[in-house]
Amino acid sequence: MKNIHCINHPLIEHKLGILRAKETKPFQFRMLIDEISSFLLFEASKDFSLKEIEISTLIQKTTVKKLDEKIMICPILRAALGMLESVFKMIPDASVGFLGFVRNEETLKADFYFQKLPKDAKKRTAIVIDPMFATGGTAIEACNFLKSQGVKKIKFISILAAPQGLKKFSQMHDDVEVFVACIDEGLNEKGYIIPGLGDAGDRVFNTL
């Protein structure tokens, strides 16, 4: 799966260990999600195009580089809201396009219930964020929708992923690069990532 990138780094592995622990408090969990998301965005943005512009320093004029892509961050509600701030800090001029999905606990399929994209979405590179990439259903439907709206370039960032979901996703969207901090063992009978870290949304918003 050439479109799947698992980012190996000692600091990511250290932070993931704390993130997984059930004793980790919500405020610390949010901080770790923020930090790991920044690492992943750094990797996902390596091929962003640049343009040269002229500026004046305090000493003289010089040529510097500036991002030449319009970016749209697409958090999948609600858990991805914990990742949004870190991406915004790195790309403050980005727009945000919200995508709302809720998982049907019986079928394990993602039901699409809300979307709010910027008017120029088709002209932007979409960075979809969702901390958990489990069955792949939500990711597939999110990319299906974005492509139906004319979005040409999509990247996906998740903290944890299951191999089953990544394989299924790659079969449907091999043109979408996925950046994850760790690929876990798999899924349990309820479709949750194992060993995982629990429900990311509940841990971010302290609703356990």
Swiss-Prot record:
Substrates-to-products reaction catalysed: UMP + diphosphate = 5-phospho-alpha-D-ribose 1-diphosphate + uracil
Annotated positions binding 5-phospho-alpha-D-ribose 1-diphosphate: R78, R103, D130, P131, M132, F133, A134, T135, G136, G137, T138, D199
Family: Belongs to the UPRTase family.
Name this polypeptide is given: Uracil phosphoribosyltransferase
The gene coding this protein: upp
Source organism phylogeny: Bacteria, Pseudomonadati, Campylobacterota, Epsilonproteobacteria, Campylobacterales
Function: Catalyzes the conversion of uracil and 5-phospho-alpha-D-ribose 1-diphosphate (PRPP) to UMP and diphosphate.
GO molecular function terms attached to this record: GTP binding; magnesium ion binding; uracil phosphoribosyltransferase activity
Keyword Magnesium included in the entry's annotation: yes
Organism whose genome encodes this protein: Campylobacter jejuni (strain RM1221)
